[in-house]
Curated annotation (Swiss-Prot):
Places the protein is found: Cytoplasm
Naturally occurring in which organism (per UniProt): Haemophilus influenzae (strain 86-028NP)
Listed EC numbers: 5.3.1.5
Keyword Repeat recorded: no
Domain of life of the organism encoding this protein: Bacteria
Residues annotated to bind Mg(2+) 2: E268, H271, D307, D309
Protein name: Xylose isomerase
GO molecular function, one term: magnesium ion binding
Recorded catalytic activity of this chain's protein: alpha-D-xylose = alpha-D-xylulofuranose
Gene designation per UniProt: xylA
GO cellular component, one term: cytoplasm
Keywords: Carbohydrate metabolism, Cytoplasm, Isomerase, Magnesium, Metal-binding, Xylose metabolism
Biological process according to GO: D-xylose metabolic process
Amino acid sequence: MTTYFDKIEKISFEGEKSTNPFAFKHYDANQVILGKTMAEHLRLAVCYWHTFCWNGNDMFGLGSLERSWQKNPNVLAGAEQKADIAFEFLNKLGVPYYCFHDVDIAPEGNSVREYVQNFHHIVDILERKQVETGVKLLWGTANCFTNPRYMSGAATNPNPEVFAWAATQVFNAMNATQRLGGENYVLWGGREGYETLLNTDLKREREQIGRFMQMVVEHKHKIGFKGTLLIEPKPQEPTKHQYDYDVATVYGFLKQFGLEKEIKVNIEANHATLAGHTFQHEIATACALDIFGSIDANRGDPQLGWDTDQFPNSVEENTLVMYEILKHGGFTTGGFNFDAKIRRQSIDPYDLFYAHIGAIDVLALSLKRAAKMLQEKTLQKIVNARYAGWNSELGQHILQGKTSLETLAQLVQQKDLAPKPVSGQQEYLENLVNQVIYS
C-alpha cells in the first residue's frame, strides 16, 4: 500500500492521561457500553470528498492544500493514487467505514461513456482495498449538483434530459454501493430548489422529484439492495430555498408520495444550524417520526449563513444528540460520518489526523456521558411524571378517540375542572445534564 502518512503507524487508544496527539483519549473501540462496544455504537466513517478531494479553495481564493494526487496529468491514475492514500488514512485511523460520491472517487470524463468506464474502474479498486483492509462502505451517493448541467436542478430540472442524466448517475452509484456492500444509499438534493419563483413551477418540480424518489425505491427493490435509503435535509445553499428544508419537511414530502416506509433521513449538524434548529431537535424529530437513519457529524457557525463543515468539538451538544439516539435504540444501518473539512490554513497533511482524532474523542466522551444519563433515568423519570396524566382514564379516552369537543366541554363544566400549572423545571434539568457531562 502507498505510504503517504509515513510518520505514524496506527492510531490507538491510550487513555485520558495521554499527551500523544496521535492517540485516542476517550475512544476505546472495544469498550462495552450498554451492551455494545463503542465501535458498534458510533459506526464511524470518513468522507471521501472533504478529506481527499477538497484542495482548500473557497470563493475568494485558490486551493491552499498540497494534494499530490490532484496534480497527476493522468486524472484516472490520480484517482488510483487517491484511493491508495484514502485507504492508508482509513486503515491508520482505525475507523470501520467510509463514504463517497461517484465523482469523488473517479473522474467524470468528457462523456457518459467515460464516466461509466472510469467509475467502474475505480470501484474495482475500492472493492479490492476493502478486502485488504477490512474497511467497509457506510454509504454511497451520486453528485448531481456540481456539473453545470445541474445548475437548474437534477430531478427538478425543467429539462427531462438532465433528469435522465441524474438517473444515470444514481443508477450507477446505487449499483456500486450494492456491489461494495454499502449499508445505506444517500440522496442529497444539492440543487433541488429555486433561486426565484419568477421562473419556477413549484408543483411540477415537486412532482418530478417525487417521481425520481419513487424510481430510486423501485430500483432498490429490483437489485435487491438491503440497505437503507436516506434523504439528507438542508434548507439552503447552494440554492436560495431547497425542497428538503429540514426533517419535518422531508417527512411531509415522503408522506405525499407514499415513501415514508421506504426512506429515512441522514441528518447533518451544520444543516440543522442553517435551518434554525438545534442538532438535537432534528435527531429527536426524526426519531419521533420513525425516519432516523444516519448522521453527518460536523458543526456549523451560528454567526455565519453558510456551511462551514467544521469538525465536531462540543461534548455538551453531542451528549444530548447521543442521548436521543440511545433512547431510540441506536443506529441500525447508519453511523457517524465525518462530513467535515480541515481549515484552509491547516496545510500539514497530519492535520487530517488531528481533526479526526479530536472529533472521534468528542463523540466517544459524549457517548459515555449520554449512556450515564440513560442509565440513571433521571431525565426520563421527570418526563414520565410530567405526562402521567395521559395514562389516566381521561387521557386514554382522548387518545383512543372516545371523546369529542362536545363531551370534553361538558366534562370540564360538570366537574368544574381547574388544572393547576406545574413547573417545567428547565433549570434543574440543565443542572442535571451539566452534572453528568462535567463529572
